[in-house]
């Protein structure tokens, strides 16, 4: 083997070693990259696991806060609706109260009504002697019907005619524009036993209050049933 052949053989060996080294280096590089990617993925997953509970906790806090805010807004809306309903009902009651003044303004019909109220009050009290209180403007009307009211009561209750004393202290006058929300009486009577232990308020205002309270569920149903549906 001459020098040329030896030189060729050495070059072939060098190429082989270099190729093998490059392949080995490439394998190492690929393996290192795969290992790096695996470690990177593991680190990412580990961080996700750390972050997830905190994220879930904050997400729950946000959901709870949203529910609370929604509930508060819903309650506020309901309160506004109820307030509007109450305002409407109260305005109807105020209009009805204004109508009472027309009742007492018609003396012909009001006089008959006063008699009925006195008889009804006597039947409730069933006392031999009572004290009657009315508005100052109604005294003459009450005195005009008093005897017939006593006789009607005595006939219905099958008792002697009672003694009725018209009190010198009067019920408040009817409401005016200046004292619309002050103490007032739209008409009617208040009867009490002599000792004052039994009192029956049979004023127009008291009867309106009782009737309105009794009919309130029906009024609300008729006014707001469609809105509720």
Curated annotation (Swiss-Prot):
* Keywords assigned by UniProt, alphabetized: Hydrogen ion transport, Ion transport, Transport
Q: Recorded GO terms, molecular function?
A: proton-transporting ATPase activity, rotational mechanism
GO cellular component terms, alphabetically, are:
proton-transporting two-sector ATPase complex, catalytic domain
* One Pfam family linked to the record: vATP-synt_E
Intrachain disulfide bonds: none
Q: Which family does it belong to?
A: Belongs to the V-ATPase E subunit family.
Q: How does it associate, per the subunit comment?
A: V-ATPase is a heteromultimeric enzyme composed of a peripheral catalytic V1 complex (components A to H) attached to an integral membrane V0 proton pore complex (components: a, c, c', c'' and d).
The record ties this protein, via HAMAP family, to: ATP_synth_E_arch
Function text: Subunit of the peripheral V1 complex of vacuolar ATPase essential for assembly or catalytic function. V-ATPase is responsible for acidifying a variety of intracellular compartments in eukaryotic cells.
What's the protein called, per UniProt?
V-type proton ATPase subunit E
Q: Which organism is it from?
A: Spinacia oleracea (Spinach)
User: What gene is this protein translated from?
Assistant: VATE
